[in-house]
């Protein structure tokens, strides 16, 4: 009897959710209900980064390097921040990424090697949760060590940083090319200053994704001078390459310095095109507002009517996490890296996605999408079919066009059957 009553209540609630009127949704700010820090402690492996739904780029804070609870790069109990990288996973049991870490600095820029067991870079900053804020599409924290306020937001393929500096003749940034989440192997690292406001670079690393190729294009609002720091350090029987770009400039009190980063798995030209298409200007607040709008479009697909604010926060935070991945993997010109690790081109009406944790998501995420966004679910299935055509088999767990082989079964069957 109790079980039947509970099931009836759940079904009744579902009908209320799916029958909600769209006019009411547009008037409500559903991002207000999301707590981006839920899941960042314990073994949740989530992060408070500034993403848009299914974004290719995931800018956010990085607080730890190694161990199982470093999977997203951020752990709530940590008290220092290494910087802000542009790629990360959410809610997974495996780790990767943490690419192109940017850290604002004031004073000496330390680069010494602290060993692979250290969770901190020498330039890490202390921070407190009292001076930290996160909401869908936006992240902010005050870096106590440097007296700098950091803010992040993003579009699908590009991130914008805004840093408020104190007065200093020794302000700058460290772009840490060799930074990774967990102990990856950096096979190639290249970075160059195109001029005194533009950097571009490339990195190939091997870890869970056995070959990850990633390019970036970055533009800064303030001219800089730079020092390229490279080295090879010995630890036990390992030779570990080091590559960092140190940027230098002067700042006035409360001067804001902005940076725009875009990425591509195809080439630097792809990263450049992504930035030009999605972030041609410097309107940080406008980009943030657009990100909020995109999140409200997702979250408003289900309207929960309850006076219990805790239940509302739990629900919309879970829904927020559901729309973080799979991730867009197609540049604005339609090019992407296929499962054969060759460059392909697709019709932009049908972009290709990656990060398919199918063993996890076939149970609940994809059934949810058949209700709230069946067209997007169809696009995911279309991507998986292309991956079969390119690589010869369907992936179990596709990670940036790498067959990781993680987990068991062929879960694509379960998610494609309802669309037939």
Report residues per predicted region:
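Twin-arginine (Tat) signal peptide motif
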Residues: 3, 418-419
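Hydrophobic helical h-region of N-terminal Sec-dependent signal peptides
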Residues: 10-12
